[in-house]
Amino acid sequence: MIRTTFAAALLAAALATPALAQNGPPPSPYTPRVDKPTCTRDELKALTAAYVEGQRSGSLAALPLHEKAQYLQNMETIEPAAGLWNTALPVANALSLHDDKRCKTFTEIVVTDGGTPYILGTRLYLHEGQVIRVDSIVTKTGDWLFNANAFLKYTKQENWQPLHAYQRTEPAEMIRGANAYLDGFSDKFTDIPWGVPCARLEGGAYTNRDNSPTASCEVGMPPGVLYIVNRDYLVDEEMGVINVYCRFGGSTGGPDSHTFRYIDGKFRQIHTLTAIPGPQANDEGGMVRGAADPNAS
């Protein structure tokens, strides 16, 4: 009896499957992301060089864009024509990372002239020679601790050269450490690989304005519980850097980019971009005096 009932249930499920499939979501209009994409580091480097020039000219036409590529700005899908990449910007500095395992790039662009300052973080996803996704985080005046002048000043003072092999950190440990940092917003007992010296550049606010050789990034996490979700990783082993795209405070929370530079297994540089309203930094990397925090309760 049990066998008969079980067999009948399996048959009913099998017969129902086509009907369920017919009522399922429509197919995506975008080319799917690939679990194990193919690319080379040289391809990725050529791609970021073309992207930076494209941002200078206001066109991505020189990029090998898939006809069904997906375009996102601040983690919302948009039409290609609506992206800031269509606006010619006077790029003051560009820092690019390349992950030839995941076939992703990340380029941090600072714009201080032209009337509207920006700090951008743009990812390109490559597979078989074509860009299948363009994903840009755009921050500007009014966003969290924003100050493009300070961001430019301190980025150019930092060392972002490729590391010697003996200075590099295993990718799995880089991901673990980045997760420990982000988990620290909800759990204050995580094992974060703090190094010395270390400096954090958050929108424009800088933790080592005095260039101290003993500076630490361990300046405390904000109180309370804040979950950092939707994490997406890019690891540049040669640079010793991991970049994490994520959302602050839930699946619809603020779009964010955290970039961690490891040397000898420890954090030495951290850059963050967060596209939510907040207090502002000044040109020296400190807080604007009397700035109101729109996120304060």
Question: PLM ranges: what are they?
Answer:
Residues 21-297:
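C-terminal and inter-domain tail/linker signature
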Residues 6-16:
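Hydrophobic helical h-region of N-terminal Sec-dependent signal peptides
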Residues 1-4:
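Positively charged n-region of N-terminal signal peptides that target proteins for export
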